[in-house]
């Protein structure tokens, strides 16, 4: 038991020292669901946030009074794919509604690779969670007096629009909207997507074999995805300000 706790702490420490920098708009999206209580509204309100990680561009959110179920999330994603194109990867947490069979079918049909957070390190999806924090803070600050769900839904849309047009230091003073729509975006064909999937699958298998039983398949898959992203210049990983070279299967655990 003590050894398990020690390994858990080491994993968390390694993750907290790493910073991921997403380079290519359109290649990796993230999604998560957050909840918020408003003073004049009963119960909780739920917001499904989906964003492009490289640009920070937040797509139109789905707002509900109950936590969205898998088919609802899938339907919302499908609309976004039709409107904005398909990412190559979709980052998400491990909640059942974000890992529902309907979503798995949608991703498979569109040849999109799921990329789940490690169970031991929730901040792996930190970019999308920071975006949620911005939305909630701005909602409470500027629209805290809304009295109907309709007003809340409209206010959430306005907040997302404002954030997409806010200059960002990490974008060199540009906005998420400009970076997503005006910059080069990934647009992989079905054939290329299949090639990427096969490469990652083979790499993950090799990682498991080399680990001699000390590596779970989902961790190996996550490592293989990260290796591909770094090698193809979609992602850079820094550790305490130092940019790391291409990751090997034995060092990239997040």
Feature annotation, model-predicted:
Residues 2-49, 57, 69-76, 83, ...:
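Mobile-element integrase/transposase regions
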Residues 53, 64-68:
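A short acidic/small-residue loop/turn micro-motif
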Residues 77-78, 103-104:
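Distinct, well-ordered alpha-helical segments
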Residues 82-100, 118-120:
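Acidic/histidine-rich, metal-coordinating catalytic segments
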Residues 104-253:
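Charged alpha-helix within mobile-element recombinases
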């Amino acid at each position: 038991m003590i050894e398990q706790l020690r390994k858990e702490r080491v994993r968390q420490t390694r993750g907290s020292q790493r910073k991921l920098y997403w380079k290519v708009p359109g290649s990796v999206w993230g999604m998560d669901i957050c909840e918020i209580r408003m003073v004049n509204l009963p119960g909780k309100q739920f917001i499904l946030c989906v964003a492009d990680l490289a640009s920070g561009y937040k797509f139109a959110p789905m707002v509900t009074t109950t936590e969205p179920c898998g088919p609802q999330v899938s339907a919302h994603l499908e609309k976004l794919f039709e409107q904005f194109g398909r990412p190559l990867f979709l980052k998400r947490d491990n909640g059942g509604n974000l890992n529902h069979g309907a979503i798995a079918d949608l991703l498979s049909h569109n040849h999109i690779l799921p990329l789940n957070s490690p169970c031991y390190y929730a901040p792996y999806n930190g970019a999308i969670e920071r975006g949620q924090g911005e939305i909630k803070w701005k909602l409470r600050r500027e629209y805290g007096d809304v009295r109907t769900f309709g007003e809340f839904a409209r206010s959430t849309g306005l907040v997302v629009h404002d954030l997409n047009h806010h200059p960002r230091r990490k974008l060199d003073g540009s906005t998420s909207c400009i970076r997503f729509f005006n910059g080069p975006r990934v647009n992989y064909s079905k054939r290329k997507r299949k090639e990427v999937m096969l490469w990652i699958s083979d790499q993950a298998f090799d990682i498991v074999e080399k680990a001699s039983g000390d590596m779970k398949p989902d961790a190996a898959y996550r490592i293989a995805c990260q290796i591909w992203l770094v090698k193809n210049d979609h992602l850079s990983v820094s550790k305490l300000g130092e940019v790391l070279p291409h990751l090997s299967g034995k060092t990239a655990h997040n």
